[in-house]
Amino acid sequence: MGAITRVQAAVCVALYGLAPAAQAQQAPPAAAQPQDQTAGALQEVTVTATRRTQTLEAVPYSMSVVSAEKLAESGVTDLASLASDVPGLSMYQYGARFTEATVPIIRGINATGEPTRGFRAFEQAPVGTYIGNSPVDGYFELDDLKQVEVLRGPQGTLYGAGTLAGALRLIPNSPELNTFAGQIEASGGKLAHSDGTPYAVRGLINIPLGDVLAFRASAKYDYQPGFVNTYGLFARSNNGLSGIPLLANPAAPVTSPAIYQDKPDWNFQKTFTGRASLLWKPADGFTAELAILHAGVQGDGGPQVNPDFPGGVSPLDPATTLPAGGPYREFSQIDQPWSRYTNLASADLTWDVGFATVSSTSSYYTTSGSVLQDNTYSLGGLASGGYLPYYAGVPTNPRFVYDQQFADFAHTFTEEVRLVSKSGPDKTFDYVLGVFYENQTSAGAWTIAVPGTPEYQAAQGCLPNCFFNVTTAPGDVTFQQIDTQRFQDKSVFGELTWHFLPKGQVTVGARHFSQEFTDAQSYDDYNFPTFLPATPHESPASKTVGKVNPSYQYADDQYVYAVWSQGFRRGGANSVPLVGPFAESPLLSTYQPDSTNNYEAGLKGRFSNGLSYTFALFDIKWDKPQISSSLPSGNLAVYNANTAESKGFEFESSGPLFVPNLVYTVSYAYADAHLTSDFSLPANNGAQTGTIVPGLIHGSSGQQMPGSPKSSASVALHYDMAIASDYDLALAANAVYRSAVPMQLTPSLGVTSVQYSSSYEMVNVNATLNHQPWRTTLYVTNLFDRENILVPPTQFNELGNLTNDYLVSIPREVGVRVAYIF
C-alpha cells in the first residue's frame, strides 16, 4: 500500500470510527486535567476572517486555524515551515534565502516554476499575507502570535486583488490592560550532519501603563548553523558581486590558480524579529493600537547538495583536484551571501458607534534584500559547454567566476476603513462596508559580473574594457536589468448577509477597484551590445469581483454551505529586448491580468465534546494564468497561458480519542491543478542569433501546475498528564506528507523537461514539562533524519555533474527549550 493510500485509509477510519466514539467520550474530572492543556486543545476556536468575531465552524467557507501552541509543537517558525505543516498550503522550499522569489500557494493556484532568480518579476503573489489587518511582504519569524488563519479560495471582496487563491492572516497578541506578565526563553540543540549548535533566545513582556494604556514587546534571535560542507571556494578580495579572486602565485597572473578553501557547515542562517505595540482604551467602545515590527535575516548559501560529482580534476582548472560529492556536500566557486530586512508600522483604531463598529487600519511597510549567486558551473554546462570559451577564454581562465546579484526593495502604504454592523439573533441583515487605498513603489536590479576577468585580461595584454574583444561596461559588469514600478489601488467593497431563516443565511459581496500600474525597465547587455532605456509602460485596470455564499445550520453547531467567489490579479510589462541576438517576440512585452472563479460546497461542525470537522469540495476556474519564468534565452518574463483549473477536496478533524486527555488532529487536501487548454508563444531559442522560434514556450492541456503537490496530509497527537503535584507533562507528535511536486510548466534556459521533487515526509515530536513558573521542552524535528529532495537539479549531468544540485530538507535537530514565565 502506497504512502498516500495509507493516508486516505486513515482518514476514512477517522471519519467512520472516531466521531461516534468521541461523542460518547466523557471529559475527565477537572482536577485530573493538566492546567490549560486539554481544555486549550479542545476549546472553541474563534476567528475574525469575516471582519467580525465568529466561531471557526460558523465561517461559511474553508479555512484552517493554527494556534500558537500548535506552531510550537510542529516546529513552525516561518511561512515556509507553515506551508509544510498545513495541507493545501505550499511553497517552493528555498528557505529565507529566496524569500522574495517564493510565495504561498493555496489549492495549486500557481503557474510559476521554481525560482531561478533572487526575486519575482514583481507580478502579484496569488495569496495575500497579513499581519493583523495589515498586508505585508518580506521575511519574519512567526513569534508572539495568537493564531494563524489560512483562508482557502479567492477572497476578492474583503481582501482585494492580491488574494487570487486565498489569504494568510497572522494574528499577533495585543497588549493586555491591567496585566503585568512576560516570558524569557532560550533553546539549544544538536543539528545532525553539522558541527554547529542551533540556538535561539526570545523574550516578551506586557506592561500596564495605568488603567487605559498597555505596552507589549517581543523579540527573538535565532541562529541555525549550516549542515552542508562546501568545496572549491575561491578566496576573494571581498564577498560581494565584484570580489576579485586572489592568486595562489602572484608572480604568474595568467596561469596562477585561485587560492582554494573549503567551508564546513557553510549554509548558516541568523534571524532577528522584534515587535512592539501600544494599546490605548480611554473609554468603552474605543481602542487604538500602534505597532512596529522589524525583522532581519542573513546567511550564506542554501541547503543545496551535490552527491553526484565523482571527484577529480576541476573542469575549469586542470591544476586543481576536487573531492567527490556526497551526502551534504556541495561545490561553489564563491561564497553566496544573502540578506533581507522587513519593517512594518501600523495603527488600528476601533470605535463602537452603537449600530456598528468603525475600524481603520493604516500601515506602512518596507522590505529590501539582496542575493548573490554563483552561476559559474551552470554557465559552463550550458550548450554542452559551448558558452564557456566565449566567457572564460581559451585556455580557460583558471580563476573564472560568473556570478549574479539580485537586489530589490518595496515601500508600501495602505489605508482601510471598515463599517461592520452589529449582529445578533434579532438582526435580519448584517453588513460590512469599506474603502481601501494602496500605494506601492518597488524596484529590483539583476546584475551579472565576471569578477577578476578584467585583471586577467590585462595580464594577457588585452586592451582596457574588453571582454575577449567585445566591449563591456567599465569594470566587470556584463549585464544589468533594472525594473522600477509604481502601483496604486483604490477600492470600495462590501458584504451583505441576509438571515432569511432562523438558521439560514446568504451573503452577497462585491469589490470594485481602480488600479494604476506603471513599469519602467532598463536592459543593458554588454556582452552582445543591447541597450534598452527605461521607458514607462502603464497598465491601468478597473474591475468588480463578486461573491455569493449561502449557508444553513441544520443542527446545533452543524453547518452546510456553498460559495462562489472571484479573485483577480493585475497585469504588467516585461523588459525583454526586441532587437539583437536575444531579441524576443513583441508578444512577450506585456502580460495580461488573470482571474479566478471559485465554486465550493462544504460541511462544518463541532460536537459538545470538542470534536470538530470540516469537509469542502472545490472547483476553481482560472482564466489567463500568469507564468513567470526564465525564457530559453535567459531573459526573464511574465506571460499568460489560456485556461487552467484546480479541483479537489479538503478534510480536517480534531477532537478527543479513546484515551483520556489524548487529542488528535488530522487533515488531508487534494488539489488537481492543471491546464485545461494548450497554449504556445514564440520565443528566442538562446542560440545568440536572434532567432525566434514559434511555439517554443508551450504547455499542454492536462499538465499539472508547478509548485504544489496534488496530495498533502498531516496527523498530530497531543497527550496531557499530571505526573505530580504542580507538575504537568504534555507529549506531542505530528507527521506530514506531500506528494511529488513539479518544478516548472514551460521550458526555460537549460531546462527542456519537467522535473519533480521527491515525495515529502516529516515527523516531529516533543515533550513539555510544566512546573510554574518554568516550562521545559525536549524537541526533535525530522525525527527520522529524512533527506527530502525539495527541488531537483534543473541542469543534469553537465560539467562533470557539477551542475547536479539538489535542494534538501533540514536534517534532524534535537534540542531543549527552557522558558521562565512571569
Each model region followed by its residue ranges:
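Membrane-embedded beta-barrel scaffold of Gram-negative outer-membrane proteins
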Residues: 202, 346-353, 357-363, 368-375, ...
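Transmembrane beta-barrel wall of Gram-negative outer-membrane proteins
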Residues: 193-300, 343, 410-415, 420-438, ...
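Outer-membrane beta-barrel domain signature, strongest for Gram-negative TonB-dependent receptors
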Residues: 256-431, 438-440, 612-614
